[in-house]
């Protein structure tokens, strides 16, 4: 995974993470074979032709920038001193800057392109953004969602889903930062240096900026956050496109949360066998009859599933659904490290966003949680930096890290990671059975699980209910595949409680 992320580190340092953290790339061309065809090769060649014609379409959208009069730090000025330096102007970084600065704390946000549009699409449950007062930052809402378990069973969920308007959300956060006198500096951060009560960042242009606290909101590939345990992440990988199509089969009032059907691979035996072991699903947002966002997603795998494999499965699925793409408006590659250990707590650099451990280990969701937890972290920062005691150094680091990750939240995180470890052990049939039982639970539990708002006790109840609602084969999966992750969970909970 380190090899996969390394060429994209610079992009991530400028555009932190999301619900779905995006690496945008133009897919390589594939030349269709010209060998004499057997029946099996015929199907492979037809797939290759479609693969080329669809994935070779260049996205027609162009990078956008915001026309906001942000206050910039003069690169030629002398010593620049702030209370808080935030690395990255993604959703998490700007949300934190907004909330810390409203208390009069001096904040500098460092990003190579702070006025650029975020590249990734974000989907959230509508009630999550309503609870945060951010409902006006949604550009489309669906009153229902659906989950296709297989060709014969579909779950309809009465929980509205929305797509985040990147433009509205970023504009709102930028304007709040401007109003609160946040300063911005256009550069990449190369190094973070520490003294006893002060830290400094060194930028790629040689500029040094000092502050009492450095917060890294630069995304998954950051080198500034330290771990004291092996980073045994699972990985979510997806290929997504916003496309104009001739037509599509989706209901306009329903967002497709997961489509686990594999009938589209009937003529693709080499893909079907792999999908049976490491399944992918379709995530679809239909906006009108000719505009739809489509994403083929591997929920979690270890090691990361081949990106080319994901794209081939998507081509086969769209062909089976009869979806003819006229043009690709936006394209995105999503790679999200999930689960694994939390960063070392405490340490000299604080984190928020993808590198802070707040990604949902079983789903990859994060943007709503970032919006919710940034004010929590801001409060811990303000209590330290804004206090009459002038808390700095190790005491400040301890306060802010434990503000984001108190004991109960760390224990809850271990429980969610247990869910991820269970998913890693399931094939397509096991995954279908699990979600069939999961979405039959009381909405309090499945909704709470997906939104990261259940307590340890509630998660235990959910597990018992899931066992009770599951089929005999689901129970067999739980009994045979969960003991090792369960023992690890109990051990980690014991360590956290010490």
Curated annotation (Swiss-Prot):
Catalytic reactions of this protein: all-trans-violaxanthin = all-trans-neoxanthin
Known EC number: 5.3.99.9
Pathway connected to this protein: Carotenoid biosynthesis; neoxanthin biosynthesis
UniProt subcellular location: Plastid, Chloroplast
UniProt transit peptide range: 1-33
Residue ranges of the region described as Disordered: 16-38
GO cellular component term, pick one: plastid
Record GO terms (molecular function): lycopene beta cyclase activity; neoxanthin synthase activity; oxidoreductase activity; oxidoreductase activity, acting on paired donors, with incorporation or reduction of molecular oxygen
This protein's UniProt keywords: Chloroplast, Isomerase, Plastid, Transit peptide
PANTHER family: CAPSANTHIN_CAPSORUBIN SYNTHASE, CHROMOPLAST PROTEIN, PTHR39757
UniProt name for this protein: Neoxanthin synthase, chloroplastic
Organism of this sequence: Solanum tuberosum (Potato)
Organism lineage: Eukaryota, Viridiplantae, Streptophyta, Embryophyta, Tracheophyta
